[in-house]
């Protein structure tokens, strides 16, 4: 019956939630430029010339860089608040040598020329030329809208607009190094910068 199928789905989701919130955890992010030779988890030399519009977490190359549940692919693991995950795994999540020329717009938070939300992995050697805008939210960047991982050796020449947290490379960044930005930043709120609106480490 339909109700028994719904119960089975609920049980599966509950089991997954217990896996994610238990105390025995370790996820090791091994995303480096050297590991880009391993093609698993790597997007390389890709170019976007199209217009991208979405609700949140919108990017010219990828919307989100994160771990995804098989049970519900639209539910990503929030690595900022979930430090206990009952699995031991290494993660290789790299976007390298990609270029965005297209206009990227999110209706809410997290718009980026390369990725909207980067919660793990590495963005390396990418270029952003298309305008990036967060219409009613925060976190817009020429490369990454919101990054809590590594963004290095990238270049942006674009317009970036957001209420708050707007940057030529990252709206908000964590490890941001060796980047070059010639971006125009606009918006009514706070925390704006040609490289990053703010960094948090």
Regions picked out by a protein language model, each given a short descriptive name:
Residues 1-201:
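Predominantly extracellular beta-rich ligand-binding scaffolds that present long acidic/polar faces
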């Amino acid at each position: 019956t339909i109700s028994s199928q719904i119960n089975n789905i609920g049980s599966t989701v509950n089991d997954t939630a217990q896996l994610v919130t238990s105390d025995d955890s370790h996820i090791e992010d091994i995303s480096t430029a050297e590991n880009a030779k391993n093609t698993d988890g790597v997007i390389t030399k890709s170019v976007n010339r199209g217009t991208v519009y979405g609700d949140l977490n919108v990017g010219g190359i990828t919307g989100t860089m994160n771990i995804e549940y098989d049970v519900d692919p639209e539910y990503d693991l929030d690595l900022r608040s979930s430090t206990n995950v009952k699995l031991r795994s290494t993660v290789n999540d790299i976007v390298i040598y990609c270029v965005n020329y297209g206009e990227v717009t999110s209706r809410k938070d997290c718009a980026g020329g390369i990725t909207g939300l980067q919660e793990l992995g590495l963005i390396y050697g990418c270029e952003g030329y298309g305008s990036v805008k967060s219409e009613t939210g925060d976190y817009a960047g020429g490369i990454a809208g919101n990054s809590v991982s590594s963004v290095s050796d990238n270049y942006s020449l674009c317009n970036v607009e957001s209420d708050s947290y707007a940057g030529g490379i990252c709206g908000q960044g964590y490890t941001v190094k060796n980047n070059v930005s010639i971006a125009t930043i606009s918006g009514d709120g706070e925390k704006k910068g040609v490289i990053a609106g703010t960094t948090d480490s």
